[in-house]
């Protein structure tokens, strides 16, 4: 079914965007002056 394919692709796209946002927030916070968590 085409709807199922669309949903799967949409979920993949959302996951990709979420991961990108997550990485950006991590990279953005790592540049600010504060001690590393590790």
From Swiss-Prot:
Q: Which UniProt keywords apply?
A: G-protein coupled receptor impairing toxin, Glycoprotein, Hypotensive agent, Secreted, Toxin
What does UniProt say on post-translational modification here? O-linked glycan consists of Hex-HexNAc saccharide.
Chief place of localization: secreted
The organism's place on the tree of life at top rank: Eukaryota
Location in the cell: Secreted
InterPro entries (UniProt xref) = Glucagon_GIP_secretin_VIP (IPR000532)
Database matches in PROSITE patterns: GLUCAGON (PS00260)
Spell out where the chain is glycosylated.
32
Q: In which tissues is it expressed?
A: Expressed by the venom gland.
The record's SMART domains line, in alphabetical order, gives: GLUCA
**What's the family?**
Belongs to the glucagon family.
What this chain does, per the entry, is described as:
O-linked and free exendin-1 and exendin-1b have vasoactive intestinal peptide(VIP)/secretin-like biological activities. They interact with rat and human VIP receptors 1 (VIPR1) and 2 (VIPR2), with the highest affinity for the human VIPR2. They induce hypotension that is mediated by relaxation of cardiac smooth muscle.
- Tell me what this protein is called: Exendin-1
The organism encoding this protein is Heloderma horridum horridum (Mexican beaded lizard)
